[in-house]
């Protein structure tokens, strides 16, 4: 959604083209990482005939804002303190998955979200 800043929502045509490309190519296991907003969050975007698209945002290791922009797709966060993000890919598990974590500078885990790889792929044809 439009938040008054430079954002993916400002480019609806390009966003639609990108999602169509993902669907056309059946590109599996995509996960987006972003930053430069001075807070952390995890967003989950749903499009028809596509698996959920996750966006992991982490930025603010040395500077954080005291506000977060609106985001109807946010499922975790926002974390407004100085922080860093960590992604761990576990392929040896019976259910391969990605763990997305946000840690603050006081060594406190603020967010942990697990995404099963089978969730971010198209059904086998």
What does each model-identified segment do?
Residues 1-125:
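Long, structured stretches of catalytic cores involved in phosphate-ester chemistry, encompassing
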């Amino acid at each position: 959604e439009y938040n008054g800043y430079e954002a993916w929502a400002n480019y609806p045509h390009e966003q639609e083209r990108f999602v169509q490309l993902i669907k056309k190519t059946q590109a599996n296991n995509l996960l987006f990482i972003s930053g430069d907003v001075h807070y952390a969050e995890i967003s989950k975007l749903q499009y028809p005939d596509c698996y959920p698209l996750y966006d992991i945002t982490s930025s603010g290791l040395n500077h954080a804002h005291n506000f977060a922009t609106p985001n109807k797709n946010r499922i975790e966060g926002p974390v407004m303190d100085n922080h860093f993000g960590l992604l761990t890919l576990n392929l040896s598990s019976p259910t391969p998955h990605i763990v997305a974590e946000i840690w603050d500078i006081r060594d406190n885990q603020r967010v942990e979200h697990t995404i099963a790889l089978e969730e971010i792929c198209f059904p086998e044809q």
